[in-house]
Amino acid sequence: MRRPLSLLRLGAMLMKEFNHMRRDRTTLGMMVGIPLIQLVLFGFAINTDPKALPTVIYSADSSAYTRSFTAALVNTGYFDVVAEARSEDTVDDMLARGQVQFAVTIPQNFSRDLVRGQRPQILVEADATDPVATGSAISALEQIKLRALSRDLLGVALPTPPSQPAFNVVVHRRYNPENITQYNIVPGLMGVVLTMTLVMITGLAVTRERERGTMENLLAMPVRPMEVMLGKILPYVIVGYVQAVIILIAAAVLFGVPVEGSVGLLSASTILFMVANLAVGFTFSTIAQNQLQAVQMTFFFFLPSLLLSGFMFPFRGMPLWAQTIGEALPLTHFLRIARGILLKGNGFTEIFPDLLAILAFVIVASGIAMARYRQTLD
């Protein structure tokens, strides 16, 4: 005979589970923390219409018309003039390094041709490795072409009809002329996949030993903490490298992503990036008490990496505090490296700042991992 539902017994089971949740503070913190992080990031940090994009001006014509055009650019809210270049080489270098999103070239004799009604052309070069970041700003250029300089040209007898703009704006999408989204997504996908898999797999490394009861055997082995750490990490470096090669081949063959730079340089950068993620995973494995906690910590690290690195949303569209957090994440710098090498043909000089940032992260994460492992030994 089946017993009827007892509210007393049900209440006892509920209290038992709540007590278990209260004791497992790590899991409880993840249950509360991850939704809060999602709320904050999606509510405040995500912006698909970035403003104040860094812009460099290269002007061979110093006139009131040039200054008025520059002011019209800034007034749209999409362009922030951060530098004035002295040569075209400087413009190319700033675009390649990712220091600016736009480069505006005003030709010589611009004001003279303007007054003569010859409709001079202004060249606007956009770093189109992230099409979403530049889309709205490029659309704003059409309004500038129609409205800018209209007040300055009042009273000037122009040979061109009033219905036509006094000058043309030629937009050149650098590194991605056809505005293909896959050129932005696929190189970044390599970093996202490596982050997700390597942090999780390594995060389970030590916790698996603890759950199986073989942790004591590992601690009794006559090996140094660094040797244990390398022994746990190096097999996954090989696995991660195979993943990266498969993704790179698929990017070139299936999606037609160009490979403008050195594959060897990208491979070396990928190894450093993998070590950074493996160090994070090893740190989590020394903190987590079980494999569930290790997986939860992985998502706790992966979610900000995915949203704040510039993979899904424009990095420059985020507020300063979100960009600061993003700069501390290795995925942010690897995305710049991968896109820079594949799409821009960047060399070691251009990617060195991002390599340095990843190396600094490796040193800090490895130091924390070794310190935590020594505590485990004690």
Place the predicted regions along the sequence by residue.
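Alpha-helical transmembrane segments and their short interhelical loops
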Residues: P225-F299, L303, F348-L355, L359, ...
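Long, hydrophobic alpha-helical segments
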Residues: Q182-T202
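Extracytoplasmic/periplasmic domains immediately adjacent to an N-terminal transmembrane anchor
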Residues: M1-Y183, E350
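Membrane-interfacial helix-loop-helix junctions in multi-pass membrane proteins
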Residues: Y175-N179, P258, G310-A365
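Junction motif at the cytosolic side of a transmembrane helix
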Residues: A205, T283, L342, A357-D378
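Short helix-capping/hinge motifs at transmembrane helix termini and TM-loop junctions
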Residues: A45-D49, G203, T207-R208, M221, ...
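Transmembrane helix boundary and interhelical loop/hinge segments in multi-pass membrane proteins
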Residues: M21, G98, V199-V223, I233, ...
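Transmembrane helix segments
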Residues: G33, L41-P50, A288-A328, T332
